[in-house]
Amino acid sequence: MMNDYKNTLNLPKTKFPMKANLLISELKILECWKKNNLYSIIRENKKGKKTFFLHDGPPYANGDIHIGHAVNKILKDIIIKFKSLFGFDAPYMPGWDCHGLPIELQVEKKINQNINKINHKIFREKCRNYALDQVNKQKKEFIRLGVIGDWNNPYLTMDFHTEANILRTFKNLIKKKYLYRGIKPINWCIDCKSSLSDSEIDYNIKESNSIDVSFSACDNNKILKIFNSEKKFDKIKAIIWTTTPWTIIANRAISVNPNFIYLLVKCNKEIFIIAESLLDKTLARLNIKKSKILGSVYGKKLKFLYFKHPLNKIHVPMILNEYVDFKSGSGIVHVAPNYGEEDYIIGKKYKLNMYDPIDSNGNYLPGTFPGLDGLNIFKSEEVVLNLLKNNHSLYSKKIINHSYPHCWRHKSPTFFRATNQWFFNIDNNNLRNKTISEIKKILWIPKWGMNQIIDLLSNRPDWCISRQRVWGVPIAVFINKKNKEIHPNTVELIEKVSKKIEKKGVQAWWDINKSEILDKDSDKYKKVLDTLDVWFDSGSTYYSILIKKWNSLNKNKVDLYLEGSDQYRGWFMSSIILSIAITGGIPCKKILAHGFVVDSNGKKMSKSIGNVISPKDIINEFGADILRLWVASSDYKSDISISKEILLRTVDIYRRIRNTSRFLLSNLNDFNPEFNSINLENMLSIDQWAIIKTNNRQKKIKNAYEEYNFHKVVSNIVDFCSLDMGSFYLDIIKDRQYTNYIDSLARRSCQTAILYIIECLVRWIMPILSFTSHEIWKYIPGKREKYVFLSEWVKEIPCENINSYISKSLWKILIKIKNEINKIIEIKKLEDKIKSSLELKITLYAESFIFEELILLKKELNFAFLVSYVSIKKYENSKENAFKSKSIKNLKILAEKFDGKKCLRCWNYTNDIVNDVKYNKICNRCINNINGVEEKRKYF
């Protein structure tokens, strides 16, 4: 007599592990990819297909990658991989930005030596070696993320040929007359000891001294006459307001708005000139309660009145400037031509003395003023205030917090300083307007990105592209010693230098003897020693690398740029401007910007706050696939939240996907697609339903991928695993899979559907869960490519004309009924009335339209609802204790314990349990299945 029926069941079996062990398995998979040169295999497989090219905005080669780097690279990798699924040849060439100050600072720190105390040739070589070390370190970290790319052939802005092509980009701008050299106030960083471009400035809150300072009139009588004052007064003073006391020493004029009304005001024994609209605010700051107006005139009447400088007693003119506004101050602005953009412009207009008493370290030069010489401008404000106070010129002082420009690298305040620099004239050849027009041809994701960059471009000044650095691409130009003009053959000369740099790198410029290039003219010229802004390096990569290296891009634009939202004024801006200036068109078809990573409270990652989470820590605790899934699950178009709790929720999502995959694989252990597959029209209704559901999900997932909405991809996959599969289909098929005759049509029908589902699911997750999809791929039966990354979307099984026994509307009703039965089952379990749902029989009381449809399915409904018996009765015959459905009108459900006995094999309760010599306590259905008598099913 048989009592143990385990060996008669088709129990699930797979070597695909339940526990992921990502930390171990991912490293093995990475080794496999490396050993077999997976990237080359993919390229060979996709050769000849339509190309998709994502241009990698180069990260800076300095330090470990942070969570923002991880987000960026993972998003790019997801895109490359999903494009491959769509049949594109999508190469990925990673890049690095390798020049500039941060590397110089790290090298100085490493060798414990100041840059000016070491041979610059040796220093550049050390910078190059340091940058290469950083590239190799970051490369390993990016590869650990599961990012597949041409890691053996990345582009580096310090590659000799790239350095030469960056210089050629500069040459082309000179050729097209976009560049000029001039003295102009630009943001200067004391720590960098260099000029900064607009994109290198952050505006942060700074504490400053807000002061009112007086300038005494040189000719009181002349002023009284202008204001038509009959009384005679001396001590007439113009009041100016400023938040930069350190600039007072460089003052060379005071300005008024020609269209404002200015008042002559008597305050005690003193007479002040103040703008009418700002009188009350100014007197309040000066703590003056009583005043008398002696006269009023428009500002234009005050032109070329002279006033005494409050410190050095030189005479400075009052000039006219329409930029003086009503927003703050006294309506009179002090002008230090070398230390402000507007000051410089108005200073040039009135031919003011461009006095520059401050050096590159932000210190006052010797001979500036007694007590100030050698002091730092930001640290000596109290000295300036005391000097003004001693001269009876300081009338108010208050500490204010206001927005002020800071160096994006050092987080230190900058100051405007007029120096000789190289500028990109973005208004030449109508470039600004043309760029705004061209920007509208790019598809921006999110859409508001277009307006953001147009606003930035509309208001930006000319681009200062020169830097006073050692490690960078040189501005390889010769300047005439006398007239300061560039050599007339500059374009040809730069090409000569570029060819030398192509062989020896940027050091070639500093090694070149002038006579090598200039012949007999060499004595008349001097080399420019400035380097190019690193944003010029990276911004020119469309031309310097892609067009030069990828000939196919000569006619075709890059498909996509993808970077953080800070790159609207950075890489996006520089790339677009340079591309339009040189090629006449935009560099790419689409630009996608992602947000910053913040903690669960919305705060940015900061070491000082202590909320930094590094990619390395996440990978070491959870694995790279969890990090990738977190990125994909986030709506990255705004700021992205991360915390331990969020990552644990991501682990739950991963577990759901993995468990679903494992269940599917475990039910395919005896399935050979070539011999066991069933045609769609012969499949059971629920298997047809599963395929239709899979098709519908695939359409949604493909659309979400194409729209770059990866969080919607994840939510669709989770809903599919949890709702379509987990809470409905997979539970229902267990009885059929485990208890039916192994080669029955009903069982093979299910396996055919399962194979289709896992074939689709593994591709859905491949761009996101690259390691897990690689692992799953090995266990799917049937002939296939060696790697999931070589595959494309599963061709959907057409289901439009399927002859299904169950209509769409009936499926919706069945799912609603099942959900309500599940709730009843849970209640009965909580009340300890049952241990298993199979102990129940269900009676459905339905109105005629539902009754007629359900009655056809009656014999198999118990399999759908996971109970032992289901009966269908008319609604009017319902019992009082029947549960009234909340989701279906005129339907009641009665759940009762079934009187039958439990089958030891299928665990269903039935009245046909057999007890004989051969079989003990099992049902006739199971006996038939054991003996190969095929169980007939249509629906479930």
Swiss-Prot record:
Gene3D superfamilies per the UniProt record, alphabetical: 1.10.730.20, HUPs, Valyl/Leucyl/Isoleucyl-tRNA synthetase, editing domain
Molecular function via GO: aminoacyl-tRNA deacylase activity; ATP binding; isoleucine-tRNA ligase activity; tRNA binding; zinc ion binding
Residues binding ATP, per UniProt: K607
Catalytic activity line of the entry: tRNA(Ile) + L-isoleucine + ATP = L-isoleucyl-tRNA(Ile) + AMP + diphosphate
Extent of the signal sequence: none
Cofactor note: Binds 1 zinc ion per subunit.
E.C. code: 6.1.1.5
Enzyme's top EC category: ligase
Matching Pfam families: Anticodon_1 (PF08264), tRNA-synt_1 (PF00133), zf-FPG_IleRS (PF06827)
Annotated Zn(2+) binding sites: C903, C906, C923, C926
Keyword terms: Aminoacyl-tRNA synthetase, ATP-binding, Cytoplasm, Ligase, Metal-binding, Nucleotide-binding, Protein biosynthesis, Zinc
Binding site for L-isoleucyl-5'-AMP: E563
Motif interval(s): 'KMSKS' region: 604-608
Family: Belongs to the class-I aminoacyl-tRNA synthetase family. IleS type 1 subfamily.
Assembly and interaction partners: Monomer.
Protein name stated in the entry: Isoleucine--tRNA ligase
Lineage: Bacteria, Pseudomonadati, Pseudomonadota, Gammaproteobacteria, Enterobacterales
